[in-house]
Amino acid sequence: MKHVFPTYKRFPIDLVNGTGTVVTDKNGKTYLDFTSGIAVCNLGHCPTNVAEAVQQQLGNIWHTSNLYECALQDSVAELIADGKERLVFFCNSGTESNEAALKLARKYTGKEKIITFEKSFHGRTFGSMSATGQAKIHQGFGELVPGFTYVPYNDIEAFRAEIDENTAAVMLEVIQAEGGVIPANAAFLLEVQLLCKKMGALLIIDEVQTGLGRTGTLYGFEQIGLDPDIFTLAKGLGNGLPIGAMVGKSDLISAFGPGSHGSTFGGNKLALAAAKEILLTMKQTGFLEEVNAKADYFRNLLEANLEVLDNVSDIRGGGFLIGIELENAAEPVITELRDKGLLILTAGTNVLRILPPLTVSYAEIDQAIYLLKSVLENQLIGSEEG
């Protein structure tokens, strides 16, 4: 790729076709995709109903800008609101969703201090990068946006010591996906919510990777009983088409009037056509129940087959967002699995991150378990011989 900035460490395969969980490279080799395009293709690759919805919209109109009313935006926003008094700002990505959330929080509260957490990841544009609690993401870019502070995740005493009446917002993930697939303790999150209310700070939950069925409910925070002031979506909202959404309680409306924020392509009709069909699918009776049944099946097999291995130190996560912490580096495991036809990711140097489509079959889960076990056993033998 001679004409593209090398901002990504790319795997040496070029994927040209995908259906469901199966993708094919330009040489005709097939793989089970347990990355879902980094938690994007929650309904699998090229789902027929989503493709048909986009195709229909392609024949009508593609783009009008946000200078005009758009019934499709309102329809999708209503589906996202899920029966609650919520308003939506549409954009194109997760980092844009988080930027919008940060702007809204500061404008509504009139305060600047924002608390996030160590090992968090919220994006790579300046505001969301400043919110990200990882020094390696900050390196080389000079002074960050002022006003951000980071505290240890799951440490309520450290958080209690940091939050005060000058805090505009607290931004967090219910599972730190990029940071190592680290779930939050429910009691910790509930106490964070209470302290936010006490101090007049807004609670922002980044659901870019955990939302839209990935962890077993439409939004990950629902499992804990949280009621965030703002939450953010992207990734699975478009199943591969670029769309993001910042979702806020309706009483925040006074801070986001005309001119306060904008996006040329945000809420474009092609992406919205996909999002509407995706949300309708996820809200079908039995859909999430089936996702949870398969996720439980997968987790049980992972624990039964991998916990006994000496090079596996932990299996954690929720739903179809799973982390496997290894005693050794994850990269050799990723490479051998790819060679054998299974695509997964890392989350740090020694954590495997597994993100199958929510539509994965039981047979595909069985095949992935077989490959994971055999490769980890091979790696263990190799390390012992070395």
Curated annotation (Swiss-Prot):
The keyword Iron does not apply. Its cofactor is pyridoxal 5'-phosphate. Its EC number is 2.6.1.11. InterPro entries: AcOrn/SuccOrn_fam (IPR004636), Aminotrans_3 (IPR005814), Aminotrans_3_PPA_site (IPR049704), Class-III_PLP-dep_AT (IPR050103), PyrdxlP-dep_Trfase (IPR015424), PyrdxlP-dep_Trfase_major (IPR015421), PyrdxlP-dep_Trfase_small (IPR015422). Gene3D superfamilies: Aspartate Aminotransferase, domain 1, Type I PLP-dependent aspartate aminotransferase-like (Major domain). Its main location: cytoplasm. It catalyses: N(2)-acetyl-L-ornithine + 2-oxoglutarate = N-acetyl-L-glutamate 5-semialdehyde + L-glutamate. One of its GO terms (molecular function) is pyridoxal phosphate binding. It is found in: Cytoplasm. May also have succinyldiaminopimelate aminotransferase activity, thus carrying out the corresponding step in lysine biosynthesis. This is Acetylornithine aminotransferase. The gene is argD.
